[in-house]
Amino acid sequence: MEIAVIGNSEFILGFRLAGITKTYAAESDEKVVEYVHKVLDDGKIGILVLNSSDMAKIPVRLRTTLENSVHPTVITLGEEEGGLSMRERIKRSVGVDLWK
């Protein structure tokens, strides 16, 4: 399983430096949506990282799909804007609560 990161060039820079190769620089809302669809179609990606402000710009139907997705598990970084916590997402994808 691979990790994919979608965001503006500043957001993805740190992930590139950490060695993540599937990074997508999306400078517009349309590009974010395009890359999200691309990642969802790629069966090799297990984790998708998005900036929470980009997640808020995604159309509601696609956002709901991402919030309920187990494969890939979607992690949003930045401001907490509702949705499931990282703990709940990990619990859903792994099947156990790792914090207990």
Curated annotation (Swiss-Prot):
Compartments in which it is found: Cell membrane
Lineage start: Archaea, Methanobacteriati, Methanobacteriota, Stenosarchaea group, Methanomicrobia
GO CC entries: plasma membrane
Subunit structure: Has multiple subunits with at least A(3), B(3), C, D, E, F, H, I and proteolipid K(x).
Protein family: Belongs to the V-ATPase F subunit family.
MF term (GO), any: proton-transporting ATP synthase activity, rotational mechanism
Keywords for this protein: ATP synthesis, Cell membrane, Hydrogen ion transport, Ion transport, Membrane, Transport
Membrane topology of this protein: Peripheral membrane protein
Protein name, per record: A-type ATP synthase subunit F
InterPro entries: ATPase_V1-cplx_f_g_su (IPR008218), ATPase_V1-cplx_fsu_bac/arc (IPR022944), ATPase_V1_fsu_sf (IPR036906)
Organism for this UniProt entry: Methanospirillum hungatei JF-1 (strain ATCC 27890 / DSM 864 / NBRC 100397 / JF-1)
Its biological purpose: Component of the A-type ATP synthase that produces ATP from ADP in the presence of a proton gradient across the membrane.
UniProt GO BP: proton motive force-driven plasma membrane ATP synthesis
Keyword S-adenosyl-L-methionine: no
Main location: membrane
